[in-house]
UniProtKB/Swiss-Prot annotation:
Species assigned in the record: Ectopseudomonas mendocina (strain ymp) (Pseudomonas mendocina)
Protein name: LPS-assembly protein LptD
Cysteine-cysteine disulfides: none
Region annotation (Disordered) ranges: 52-96
A Gene Ontology biological process term: Gram-negative-bacterium-type cell outer membrane assembly
PANTHER family attached to this UniProt entry: LPS-ASSEMBLY PROTEIN, LPS-ASSEMBLY PROTEIN LPTD
GO cellular component: cell outer membrane; transporter complex
Family: Belongs to the LptD family.
């Protein structure tokens, strides 16, 4: 039982517990008590002790010199003592823990893996032989400041010298104050100096940190301590180390002299940091060290005069792990990122990257978060010394990029968004990588949006421009501006829903003209003409579009099914501007020209009605699937759609395309995306879906199949396509559309789509994907997929027409000779993709991917290698082959170049990656489930 000391604490913060031996001042200082006392401070400042029941004989007062490390007390009749061997110094351990203190390293709270609980195993690393588990103790969660907290003391024996004001304790000595606890074999507490000396098996515990040593000095009023021959453990961070001595400051900061730091297990020193002065700050979660060597198996491999490293997952300013690499275009590269932890709600990162062939790329980003907004601002600049592209069109040697992504809620209904990126030249992302998270597609967005959400409507103002990030695409239309208002009336007379959709948008763009200059300075040839300059007729138009779409429907829903009849009217008004070349193309008298018979109208319009009837039923029954109890559903659906034909050949195509056919196409009101074409339809779509659902809600299997029956040809097509030349536009039926999903369990999944053309007796498109990744062992990943698609409707940049032809160019030139630039099946998709990460042995895993294009008989990407993973470090070595897209010509056949590389990644857990961080990029992009694997890994 602890006795709490009141006002006396300020002078000498000592509280004496049961089993503590104390001597009254009246006794001789050389006598020994044969009974125990409960003591507390008297009103005069002395001790007031009451005797307890007699117990067994206590050992005599320990006799030791001030410099002694530890002395073993014998019985009262002992006449001689045996000299103990000198302790092993931590400097002799070479990064390992001292087995001399405990062969099983239990002195560091190390618990073997087979003795961990299920919860502790979940927190431990997958390849760790155990974990540091802090034992429960009184007051471990106490956050009271030391100067406001009493001290509790317990020991098997004690002695107090009134004249010197020294209390001597022996046997399982424990001092506890607030959340800090110190243990030792022996202790001397000096009341006048408010300090203590502890000897033998010293343990200091505080805020998830344990420091073990042979001898310690403790300042009793503020918790400052020095522990000699020290080892330490930080339980949550799973790190340990040692030092000639360790100092604990009043602020709980730990300073180590000749200290080490590692995340490796106590008996392992695969790697560790060693520095003259090491500082660990649990309050900030970071440490620093000076004159540091990184040692692998005690061999120094790296030196730095200063290092700043994390000891937990909190953010803090400092250098992030560097990245080294080589490439044919950049040469040797070194990136040394620096992170600025400016405030809890905003930070910044600088990414200086030195490239031997190009120079120094300075890239950085600033991120922010407020109660109503979030976003990031980034930028980069490089004075490019690589002159390979200096003759190419639109190239700039002063390379730059800046971006701003922002979201802000102006109130509960109004949302503002910005996504703006600009680049110096269209080759920027082909030559340079970015760490700012910008999606490097064929263009970058320059968009600002205001969205207002009412109770029954949504209004949006959008300003959207594009900056091309390549030279082989046609300049897209900017929407400057786009205004939409969609919703329904707030009343429902007779159960009717009155809906409306409105849009106004202005389309504008600046077309390139003239000829492209390639990297050799060659230009002026027909194939060098910019694709923008090859546009003809209405494809060169810009203008404005106003679209109105009122509708009324009667949704009827029951537990067993639904019926929804709907009527709409779609009206679109245009204001079209066309340059002289476009008007001249429309005036052609050539019947073979796609613009023959098309008149230029400055204000074309279109109005067309739409009727649809959607209906479905729902049935279910209890059944079994492979011995499992399930509820099977049967959900037939019928959808009738009628849209009359309206001639739309005089309307330009601004933002419209034709999506590829799928099961979802059966239920669409318009087979085109965008509003420049409203497809004529007179069809009935029939489909059925069946699901197998287990009692816990797990969907084991799902199967859908459907087909559309056409009563009229689909005459409305994209510009340049004659419906009479498209078999699928004149067929009476659509392809059979199938979708299938089966989950073998929560880890195994198989999904497939399949579209079969009954007229051609051929597959239009299909896919099959197998994915395996166990929840309880995400280190295992298997992906096997196949995709086939031969029904893509695309705009052919070379000919300037819409087409379904999958080839690039024509097989022959105008003179009948073979076309050297012709590429068969260039746009056809016929690929398999296989990837795997699989453990071969404990700690060893195979990593591989193979993506192959059957249409062009070539490997798109292939890599293979291995991974070694231990408790404290990881290594990956991967050999990779891939197709690199680097635009040097308008001819796609010259822009695909194979490349190869061997990639090494080393990760020192607790420090981050040392080399090869870029390996993460292609593993994340190439292997489904890789990110989940890394996120769930310890």
């Amino acid at each position: 039982m602890a006795v709490k000391h009141p006002a006396f604490r300020k002078k000498f913060p000592l509280l004496v517990t049961g089993s503590l031996l104390a001597l009254q001042p009246a006794f001789s200082l050389q006598s020994f008590a044969a009974e125990q006392y409960d003591c507390q401070a008297s009103p005069t400042g002395g001790w007031a002790c009451a005797p307890k029941t007699a117990t067994s004989a206590l050992p005599p007062r320990p006799q030791h010199s001030r410099s002694a490390v530890s002395t073993t007390s014998g019985s009262a009749t002992a006449t001689a003592t045996k000299q103990e061997p000198a302790p092993v110094l931590v400097t002799e351990s070479k990064g390992r823990a001292l087995a001399s203190r405990s062969p099983d390293y239990s002195h560091l709270d190390w618990v073997p893996r087979d003795k961990l609980t299920a919860a502790q195993l979940a927190e431990a690393g997958p390849y760790c032989a155990g974990a540091y588990i802090e034992p429960l103790r009184p007051g471990m969660d106490d956050t009271t400041p030391l100067d406001e907290s009493p001290m509790y003391v317990s020991a098997k024996a004690s002695r107090y010298e009134q004249e010197k004001q020294i209390a001597t304790l022996a046997g399982d000595v424990v001092l506890r104050q607030s959340g800090m606890q110190v243990e030792a074999d022996e202790a001397s507490l000096h009341q006048a100096e408010n300090r203590g000396e502890l000897v033998g098996n010293v343990r200091l515990r505080d805020k998830g940190t344990l420091v073990v040593g042979d001898r310690a000095e403790l300042q009793l009023d503020n918790g400052e301590a020095r522990i000699d021959n020290a080892e330490y453990v930080m339980h949550q961070a799973h790190v340990r180390g040692s030092a000639l001595y360790a100092k604990r400051e009043e602020t709980a900061i730990i300073r180590l002299k000749d200290g080490t730091y590692t995340r490796c297990e106590p008996g392992d020193n695969a790697w560790h940091l060693k520095g003259n002065n090491v500082t660990l700050n649990p309050a900030t979660g970071f440490g620093t060290a000076t004159n540091v060597t990184l040692r692998v198996k005690d061999i120094p491999v790296f030196y730095t005069p200063y290092i700043y490293f994390p000891i937990d997952d909190r953010r803090q300013s400092g250098f992030l792990p560097p990245s080294l690499g080589t490439s044919s275009s950049n040469g040797f590269s070194l990136q040394t990122p620096y992170y600025f932890n400016l405030a809890p709600n905003y930070d910044a990162t600088l990414y200086p990257t030195y490239m031997a062939k190009r120079g120094l790329l300075m890239e950085g980003e600033f991120r922010y978060l407020t109660e109503s907004s979030e976003g990031q601002v980034g930028g980069a600049w490089l004075n490019d010394q690589e002159d390979e592209r200096k003759l190419q069109s639109e190239y700039e040697d002063q390379r730059w990029m800046y971006s701003w992504q922002h979201k802000q809620g102006l109130n509960s209904r109004l949302l503002a968004e910005v996504d703006y990126t600009d680049i110096s030249d269209p080759y920027y992302f082909q030559d340079l990588d970015t760490d700012l998270g910008i999606e490097t597609q064929s263009y970058v967005n320059q968009r600002g949006t205001l969205t207002y959400r009412g109770d029954s409507y949504t209004a949006r103002l959008n300003v959207h421009a594009y900056e091309l990030a390549n030279i082989t695409d046609i300049t897209p239309y900017d929407r400057l501006p786009q205004i939409t208002l969609d919703g329904k009336l707030p009343f429902n007379p007779g159960g009717l829903d009155f809906t409306y959709g409105t849009e106004y948008v202005r389309f504008d763009r600046n077309l390139r003209s003239g000829f492209f200059v390639d990297k050799d300075g060659v230009t002026g040839r027909p194939q060098d003409l910019w694709y923008d300059a090859r546009l003809t007729g209405l494809n060169r138009a810009d203008g404005e579009r106003l679209h109105l779409e009122p509708g009324v429907s009667l949704p009827l829903n029951w537990s067993w099914g639904f019926v929804k009849p709907q009527v709409k009217y779609l009206h679109t008004q245009y204001q079209v501007n066309l340059d002289g070349q476009g008007k001249a193309d429309l005036a052609t008298n050539d019947p073979e020209n796609q613009w023959f018979g098309v008149d230029y109208k400055g204000s074309p319009n279109r109005g067309v009605g739409l009727f649809s009837l959607d209906s479905g039923l729902y049935f279910d029954r209890n059944t079994q699937l492979f011995g499992r109890e399930t509820r099977q559903t049967l959900e037939p659906r019928a959808f009738y759609l009628y849209v009359p034909e309206e001639d739309q050949t005089d309307i330009p195509i601004f933002d419209t395309g034709e999506p590829t056919f799928s099961y979802a196409s059966l239920w669409r009101e318009n087979r085109f995306s965008g509003k420049d074409r409203i497809g004529d339809e007179n069809k009935l779509s029939l489909g059925v879906t069946s699901r197998w659902i287990e009692p816990n809600g797990f969907e084991r299997q799902r199967f859908s199949v459907g087909q559309a029956f056409y009563f009229e040809d689909r005459k409305v097509q994209l510009a340049g396509i004659d419906y009479r030349g498209r078999q699928d536009a004149t067929s009476d039926v659509s392809p059979y559309a199938l979708e299938y999903l089966y989950r073998f369990n929560r880890d195994w999944r198989f999904s497939s789509t399949f579209n079969w053309d009954p007229d051609q007796h051929a597959t239009r498109s299909g896919s099959a994907m197998f994915h395996y990744q166990p929840e309880d062992n995400p280190n295992k990943i298997v992906n096997l997929g196949y995709r086939y698609r031969n029904d893509i409707v695309r705009y052919d940049r070379d000919s300037g027409t819409w087409t379904t032809n999958p080839d690039y160019g024509n097989p022959t030139l105008a003179d009948g000779s073979p076309n050297p630039n012709y590429i068969k099946n260039y746009y056809k998709i016929d690929q398999h993709d296989f990837s795997v990460i699989w453990p071969l042995a404990p700690q060893w895993s195979l990593i591989s991917r193979w993506q192959y294009d059957y249409g062009r008989n070539r490997t798109l990407e292939a890599f293979g290698g291995f991974e070694y993973d231990s408790c404290c470090w990881k290594l990956r070595l991967i050999n990779r082959y891939w197709i690199d897209y680097d635009e040097v010509s308008l001819d796609p056949s010259r822009n695909d170049e194979p490349d190869r590389g061997i990639f090494l990644q080393i990760v020192l857990k607790g420090l981050g990656g040392v080399v090869g961080n870029k390996v993460e990029t292609f593993l994340d992009q190439g292997i489904q489930g890789y990110r989940e694997r890394e996120d769930q890994a310890f």
